[in-house]
């Protein structure tokens, strides 16, 4: 009977065949231990010399790392294993023998591993990170579908940009200039006027020359837009969404979190409502903490965000940033028109901003004024202005960076490990 490592628990004391790769092995004169993986998990295969044909044991000792195999044997309980079971191997069939696999069990430098990213993905920890990424995506769809959102797919090639063109990749669209999208927001706002609540999930591109552990050139973003929704209501949706995702990973990725040695007690504390601190109060807090490199009207850097998040040791909303450091489409704060109705959600443990969101300007005259103030081409935004001409309503939206969120939840140090094939300032291969 053919099965998988994940399903093998349903076949205790039965003989099964599993297609797998050999990740590692060790042997003595009488027994060989094969570390097997098949994409669904990792399992140990035990080959006892006295219980198999001589050729099988010889093969078990000689087979090379990352060779592909069909392994047949009996599934037995093993309380020492993370899985709780292992295979007593009876026969081995080699599908393809691997020669001189470059990523050996010894330590390798990061650049070497990134050069071999197509192979590094096979390692136990990288496999665990990708499984957590997959669970975050699954939980995202679950949350939005249950909450009545409609999925919309905005274009990747665009003629205009929600935040200006200075950090966009320019390309040719036949005889026109086009940009790789940095956000689907403007299109989602249009879709929200048709469907009420919408979300998207797709790649975004930022031509930022950043080399920090938080930045990728290409990353995936989950964006939501909600009609008839105010800023406070939007924050509630955001914190409910993040809490749902964290709980889903805790429930469905226990083994992966253990492999990554993640301190799950920090994740277990994540619950609504999240703390909120205004930009004004955050400035005062930072100055009291000894930060003399930040003044009102300046954006926060990584050390500032980390200090604020560490104070709460939870995801925290920083609200109502100054108008002059935020994009043109954000609604003024009626209590202080030098600020806007926006919030950044800062993850704890130094992972930085994972969500940016705001209430959107819904008044046509004000939006036209903002477009001019930011030096944007009004014609390029004519469709966006139309949304305020024909039945404008209060509405809000937000975007969550998938890779940063996965980095925080999984506890990995650098965001590059949370994308299958990350695009960095100095890396376009593989």
UniProtKB/Swiss-Prot annotation:
Its EC number is 6.1.1.22. Gene3D superfamilies: Bira Bifunctional Protein, Domain 2 (3.30.930.10), Nucleic acid-binding proteins (2.40.50.140). The keyword Aminoacyl-tRNA synthetase applies. CDD domains: AsnRS_cyto_like_N (cd04323), AsxRS_core (cd00776). One of its GO terms (biological process) is asparaginyl-tRNA aminoacylation. It catalyses: tRNA(Asn) + L-asparagine + ATP = L-asparaginyl-tRNA(Asn) + AMP + diphosphate + H(+). One of its GO terms (molecular function) is ATP binding. InterPro entries: Aa-tRNA-synt_II, aa-tRNA-synth_II, aa-tRNA-synth_II/BPL/LPL, Asn-tRNA-ligase, Asp/Asn-tRNA-synth_IIb, NA-bd_OB-fold, NA-bd_OB_tRNA. Keywords: Aminoacyl-tRNA synthetase, ATP-binding, Cytoplasm, Ligase, Nucleotide-binding, Protein biosynthesis. The keyword Transferase does not apply. It comes from the Bacteria. One of its GO terms (cellular component) is cytoplasm. It is found in: Cytoplasm. Homodimer. Belongs to the class-II aminoacyl-tRNA synthetase family. This is Asparagine--tRNA ligase. The gene is asnS.
């Amino acid at each position: 009977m053919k099965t998988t490592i994940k399903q093998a628990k349903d076949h205790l004391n039965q003989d099964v065949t599993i297609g797998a790769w050999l990740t590692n092995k060790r042997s003595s004169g009488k027994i060989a231990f094969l570390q097997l993986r098949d994409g669904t998990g990792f399992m140990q295969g035990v080959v006892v010399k006295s219980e198999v044909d001589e050729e099988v044991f010889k093969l078990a000792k000689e087979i090379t790392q990352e060779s592909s195999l069909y392994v047949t044997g009996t599934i037995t309980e093993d309380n020492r294993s993370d899985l709780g079971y292992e295979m007593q191997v009876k026969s081995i069939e080699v599908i393809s023998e691997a020669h001189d696999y470059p990523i050996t069990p010894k330590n390798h430098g990061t650049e070497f591993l990134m050069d071999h990213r197509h192979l590094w993905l096979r390692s136990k920890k990288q496999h665990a990170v990708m499984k957590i990424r997959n669970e975050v995506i699954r939980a995202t769809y679950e949350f939005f579908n249950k909450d009545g959102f409609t999925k919309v797919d905005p274009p990747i090639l665009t003629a205009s940009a929600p935040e200006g063109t200075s950090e966009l990749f320019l390309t040719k669209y036949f005889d026109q200039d086009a940009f790789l999208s940095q956000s689907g927001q403007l299109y989602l706002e249009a879709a929200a006027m048709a469907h009420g609540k919408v979300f998207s999930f797709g790649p975004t591109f930022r031509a930022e020359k950043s080399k920090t552990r938080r930045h990728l050139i290409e990353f995936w973003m989950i964006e939501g837009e909600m009609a008839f929704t105010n800023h406070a209501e939007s924050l509630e949706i955001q914190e409910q969404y993040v809490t749902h995702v964290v709980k889903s990973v805790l429930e469905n990725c226990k083994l992966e979190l253990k492999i990554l040695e993640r301190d799950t007690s920090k994740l277990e504390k994540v619950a609504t409502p999240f703390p909120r601190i205004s930009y004004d109060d955050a400035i005062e807090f930072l100055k009291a903490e000894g930060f003399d490199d930040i003044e009102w009207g300046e954006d926060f850097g990584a050390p500032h965000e980390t200090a604020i998040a560490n104070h709460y040791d939870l995801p925290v909303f920083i609200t109502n940033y100054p108008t002059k450091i935020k994009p043109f489409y954000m609604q003024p704060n009626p209590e202080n028109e030098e600020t806007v109705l926006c919030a950044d959600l800062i993850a704890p443990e130094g992972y930085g901003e994972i969500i940016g969101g705001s209430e959107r300007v819904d008044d046509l005259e004000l939006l036209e004024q903002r477009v001019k103030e930011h030096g944007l081409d009004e014609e390029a935004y004519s469709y966006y202005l139309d949304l305020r001409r024909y039945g404008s309503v209060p509405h809000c939206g937000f975007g969550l960076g998938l890779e940063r969120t996965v980095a925080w939840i999984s506890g990995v140090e650098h965001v590059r490990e949370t994308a299958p094939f990350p695009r960095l300032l100095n890396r376009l291969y593989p």
